[in-house]
């Protein structure tokens, strides 16, 4: 499981941030192109990217896919109330499910919040009534379906 909230913070300077911004624009951008754009040696870019990977700032390089264009009609946000002693256990089980895109323990009215992507309403129903129902410790859920997208981004680098 990815531990985000309590991870050790990595010091980023302006060169690191510039590299990260460019890679977020185009993850396939070559080190030589990044080097040219930010006016530092290619060896510096290569060393910085390797350090950012090693320190966990860059988790992986992947395509950012539009789920709707790829045949997934439903993006849903599910708030979960769990038995207090089983919150972590519930999260560990939910993390194993391929439909789950984002998952975390939260503050506020619920214990756990997640984003799931499925092909249609029937698949969402099966996910909730069959897969989630098997997980011990879930007391209740509240599901909201995304009806339109105004912005779909990723972690910003300040």
Swiss-Prot record:
Q: Give the GO cellular component terms, alphabetically.
A: cytosol
- Which Pfam families does the UniProt record give? AsnC_trans_reg, HTH_24
Q: Which UniProt keywords apply?
A: DNA-binding, Transcription, Transcription regulation
Q: Which domain of life is it from?
A: Archaea
- Keyword Hydrolase found: no
Molecular function terms, GO-annotated: sequence-specific DNA binding
Q: Which InterPro entries match?
A: ArsR-like_HTH, AsnC-type_HTH_dom, Dimeric_a/b-barrel, Tscrpt_reg_AsnC-like, Tscrpt_reg_AsnC/Lrp_C, WH-like_DNA-bd_sf, WH_DNA-bd_sf
Annotated ranges, domain HTH asnC-type: 12-73
* Residue ranges of DNA binding: 31-50
GO BP: any one term = response to amino acid
> What name is this protein filed under?
Uncharacterized HTH-type transcriptional regulator PYRAB01370
Lineage of origin: Archaea, Methanobacteriati, Methanobacteriota, Thermococci, Thermococcales
């Amino acid at each position: 499981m990815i531990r985000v909230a309590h991870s050790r913070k990595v010091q980023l300077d302006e060169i690191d941030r510039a590299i990260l911004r460019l890679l977020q624009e185009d993850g396939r951008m070559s080190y030589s192109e990044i080097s040219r754009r930010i006016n530092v040696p290619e060896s510096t870019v290569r060393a910085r990217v390797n350090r950012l990977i090693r320190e966990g700032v860059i988790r992986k390089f992947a395509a950012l896919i539009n789920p709707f264009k790829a045949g997934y009609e439903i993006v849903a946000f599910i708030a979960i109330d769990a038995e207090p002693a089983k919150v972590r256990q519930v999260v560990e089980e939910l993390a194993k499910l391929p439909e789950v895109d984002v998952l975390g323990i939260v503050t506020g009215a619920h214990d756990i919040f997640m984003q799931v992507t499925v092909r249609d309403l029937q698949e969402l129903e099966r996910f909730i009534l069959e897969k989630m129902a098997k997980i011990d410790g879930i007391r209740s859920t509240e599901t909201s379906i995304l009806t339109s997208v105004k912005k779909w981004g990723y972690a910003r680098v300040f």
